[in-house]
A protein has these predicted regions:
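N-terminal beta1-alpha1 cap of cysteine-dependent amidohydrolase-like domains
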Residues: 1-172
C-alpha cells in the first residue's frame, strides 16, 4: 500500500497511519502470522495495550511454513465415509492429516471415497485405492455405508495398507 493510500485509509478509518497494514492473500493460512509480523502488527497491538515490545522469534514458524510450501515427499491417503460429499464433516480429520504431513515434511493428498459406493462386491477396490498409502475410516452413525467401510478395512488388511479407524471406523 502506498504512503498516500495509508494516509487516506488512516484519515477515513480514524486510525494512526502507522496502524494501517497491508493484508495480502497468503498461499497458506500459516503464513499470515509471518506477514502480520512483517507489517508490525505485533508492535502496534502491544503499543496500544501499553505493553513492552520485544521481537518474537518466528524461526520455528518460518521452518514450518517452508515445509508446507516445499514438502520433501507426497502421500495419498483414502478417507472412507458416507459424508465425503461434504468434506467439512471431516474437518478435524483433514486438519489432523495435514498437520501430520507437515510434521513429516510430506504433502498429504486426500482421496475421498464414498463408503456406500464401494459396498457392492463388483466394485474393484484396487482401482478405488490405487496409489493410496493409507486408508482412514472416520467415525459415523447408523448402518448406512457400514458395509463399504468394512470392505475398505478388509482391503487394507489383505493388502498390507496402513489403516486407521476412528470411533465407528475402528469398530468396522
Amino acid at each position: 500500500i502506498s504512503s498516500d493510500m495509508k494516509e487516506k485509509l488512516a484519515l477515513f478509518c480514524d486510525v494512526d497511519k502507522s496502524a494501517v497494514i497491508e493484508n495480502l492473500t497468503a498461499p497458506t493460512i500459516y503464513e499470515v502470522p509471518l506477514m502480520m509480523a512483517k507489517e508490525g502488527l505485533d508492535k502496534i497491538v502491544l503499543e496500544k495495550l501499553h505493553m513492552d515490545y520485544s521481537p518474537a522469534n518466528m524461526e520455528e514458524w518460518e521452518k514450518m511454513v517452508f515445509k508446507i510450501k516445499h514438502p520433501a515427499k507426497k502421500v495419498k491417503v483414502a478417507v472412507v465415509g458416507k459424508y465425503v460429499d461434504l468434506p467439512d464433516a471431516y474437518m478435524s480429520v483433514t486438519e489432523a492429516l495435514h498437520h501430520a504431513g507437515i510434521a513429516n515434511d510430506t504433502d498429504v493428498k486426500i482421496a475421498w471415497v464414498n463408503s456406500e459406493a464401494i459396498e457392492a462386491a463388483d466394485v474393484e477396490l484396487s482401482e478405488v485405492f490405487a496409489g493410496c498409502k493409507g486408508i482412514l475410516v472416520p467415525g459415523g452413525f447408523g448402518d448406512r455405508g457400514v458395509e463399504g467401510k468394512i470392505r475398505a478395512v478388509q482391503y487394507a488388511r489383505e493388502n498390507a495398507i496402513p489403516f486407521l479407524g476412528l470411533c465407528l471406523g475402528m469398530q468396522c
